[in-house]
């Protein structure tokens, strides 16, 4: 289970994750996710074009958990490469959600969302919430193109394997 420590979570958050997992065993469960979009069979669109998922989706490799909402990873759901710290730091050092998603896909583990996915995040730092903090945050770094670079690093490094897994599931049209 992963969750950010700077987010307020509602009281039933963990219970919702667990109940969804019981109905979808052998599936990674996200309380917040985006739907990955592609330009073509081997070309992924930029992160800002991936829409937030606002309702339960069938398990899919294209459901991309956003770590801030919390994600339940069942035992052995991720590739053993997840522990390759050097590769993680090389490909996506500030985007662990990108790394964890790839490690799930490479282990042939699909992802789904809770019935009512989180649409809005409430941060503990109210200055960040209203946009008045001057500090550079991981979120602001990734929003300024950091996510796209790290996503492309993953797709380029694990090409064609990661595309083949997704394409074999016939999810990309």
Q: How should these model regions be labeled?
A:
Residues 1, 24-26, 91:
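Generic secretory/membrane-interface signal
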Residues 1-8:
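Short beta-strand-to-loop acidic/aromatic patch adjacent to the donor-nucleotide binding site
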Residues 4, 68, 90-91:
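Short, flexible active-site loop motifs that bind/organize anionic cofactors or intermediates
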Residues 4, 32-33, 115:
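Glycine-rich, histidine-containing beta strand-loop boundary motifs that form or position
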Residues 8-86:
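Conserved catalytic core of nucleotide-sugar-dependent glycosyltransferases
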Residues 80, 85-173:
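C-terminal catalytic/acceptor-binding lobe
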């Amino acid at each position: 289970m992963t969750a950010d420590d700077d987010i307020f979570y509602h009281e039933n958050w963990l219970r919702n994750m667990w109940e969804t997992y019981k109905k979808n065993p052998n599936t990674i469960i996200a309380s917040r996710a985006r739907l990955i979009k592609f330009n073509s069979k081997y070309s992924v669109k930029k992160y800002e074009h991936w829409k937030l998922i606002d309702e339960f989706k069938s398990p899919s490799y294209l459901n991309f958990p956003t770590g801030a909402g919390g994600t339940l990873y069942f035992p052995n759901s991720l590739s053993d490469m997840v522990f390759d710290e050097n590769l993680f730091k090389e490909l996506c050092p500030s985007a662990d959600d990108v790394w964890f998603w790839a490690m799930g896909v490479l282990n042939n583990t699909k992802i789904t969302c809770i019935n009512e996915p989180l649409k809005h995040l409430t941060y503990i730092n109210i200055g960040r919430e209203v946009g008045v903090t001057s500090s550079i945050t991981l979120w602001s770094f990734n929003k300024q193109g950091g996510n796209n670079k790290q996503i492309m690093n993953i797709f380029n490094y694990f090409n064609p394997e990661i595309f083949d897994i997704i394409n074999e599931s016939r999810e990309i049209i």
